[in-house]
Amino acid sequence: MGRTRKANVCPRLSRRALGFYTRDAGVVQRTNLGILRALVCQESTKFKNVWTTHSKSPIAYERGRIYFDNYRCCVSSVASEPRKLYEMPKCSKSEKIEDALLWECPVGEILPDPSDYKSSLIALTAHNWLLRISATTGEILEKIYLASYCKFRYLSWDTPQEVIAVKSAQNKGSAAARQAGTQPPVLLYLAVFRVLPFSLVGILEINRKVFENVTDATLSHGILIVMYSSGLVRLYSFQAIIEQFMQQKLDLGCACSQGGTTGTVGEAPFGIPCNVKITDSPPPLFEVSSLENAFQIGGHPWHYIITPNKKKQKGVFHICALKDNSLAKNGIQEMECCSLESDWIYFHPDASGRIIHVGPNQVKVLKLSEVENNSSQHQISEDFVIWANREDRKENLITVTASGRVVKRNVNLLDDDPEQETFKVVDYEDELNLLSVVAVTQIDAEGKAHLDFHCNEYGTLLKSIPLVESWDVVCITTGTLSCKGFLYKRHLLGHVLVSPDSPVP
């Protein structure tokens, strides 16, 4: 394993008090986070359950705020005990919030309204309104009516904190049409906005006549990603599509005529017409075939991860260079495990270019580096591995032959055997630079879990925190570490455990 060194925060506190870091705000921030990490990970720090609540709807968490009742109620988890920030008035089912993103003030931009400098929740309602809500008071600051010709359902960042994409539900047509083998020409719509102040980029339709056999599409970092039933994934330049196929430029709040109807763009009942209609298939920037359209890009230099497009290849991952599609040395990664649930792989979110490969009993962190004496080729190697705490257990399988002879054979158990410690969640805490891992062991009818903090650089175990309550494996959704503690959430019950109750080391 890597180096282990117990950090003492007292010298850093003394230097901070003497003003050693006053000339550089970034150094102050990093110093404060280093102190916090030392407090969180020290052996004497104890975490306790300070607050419990119930929710019939899923619980969401963003930057120290916990959202209940479809984002209608917001609770701050920053204080020593969570407190309610606001609760919006009750609304009908058609007005509930379907999805939301937290927007935070950009640096260096002059905004038109003082309220724009405070965090906002960008929310999408069930009846196609896009709202900007104050993250501290719940007041609705802006509202845009999208359209009546489709049902918008999903929000995502195209460019984080700058451009959002609002995606509609897929148009599958009526049951009678499907039975007759006919499909509506438009699969879905993508509405794209620049945020603060809100401005419309355009609404794009994904047409089955242009993108034949298309099954889904999304937008990320200016790239339109289109997925096909054959497993093919194609990438297109969204900017080039806008320049070539935009029918008319639309501005929010301005008058517009469409199909004989006149109205104001972004106001009900007119909404926003679809103004980007692709008539010819644009040239793709890149295409690749992958099982279940699974495709990721990352690393330094750019590489991508796919699974070969054959069912028997499930669980096999190929890591290839984006520039020439060449397979990296040791680029075929297959975790030799026998389990009911598949392992998963993704580029590390810390922008180090590393790769995280998670299986039921191990977490591999892989690094991408140049091949010695060949700078044009790259190789995959292990940076470190986190292993589950398990016993080497085998069961005897007894078989009786036709002649009556008894044959005993050793049989290995499943790698995700619930009675063995199994990894369920792996998450990265960027501010404290910690890799957090949740491991679960099923004991009788209840599951016991613990949350481990590992050094993101070396994989060293820094802290293990048992979760006292039983853990229902079926209901696990995610684990999130905040600056003062952590939240683990379930569909019916959420617990927030915060504030180390121990002296400074």
UniProtKB/Swiss-Prot annotation:
Its main location: membrane. InterPro entries: DCAF17. Keywords: Membrane, Nucleus, Transmembrane, Transmembrane helix, Ubl conjugation pathway. It is a multi-pass membrane protein. The chain crosses the membrane at residues 186-206, 222-242. Pfam families: DCAF17. GO terms for cellular component: Cul4-RING E3 ubiquitin ligase complex; membrane; nucleolus. One of its GO terms (biological process) is acrosome assembly. It comes from the Eukaryota. Pathway: Protein modification; protein ubiquitination. The keyword Transferase does not apply. It is found in: Membrane; Nucleus, Nucleolus. PANTHER family: DDB1- AND CUL4-ASSOCIATED FACTOR 17. Interacts with DDB1, CUL4A and CUL4B. May function as a substrate receptor for CUL4-DDB1 E3 ubiquitin-protein ligase complex. This is DDB1- and CUL4-associated factor 17. The lineage of its organism: Eukaryota, Metazoa, Chordata, Craniata, Vertebrata.
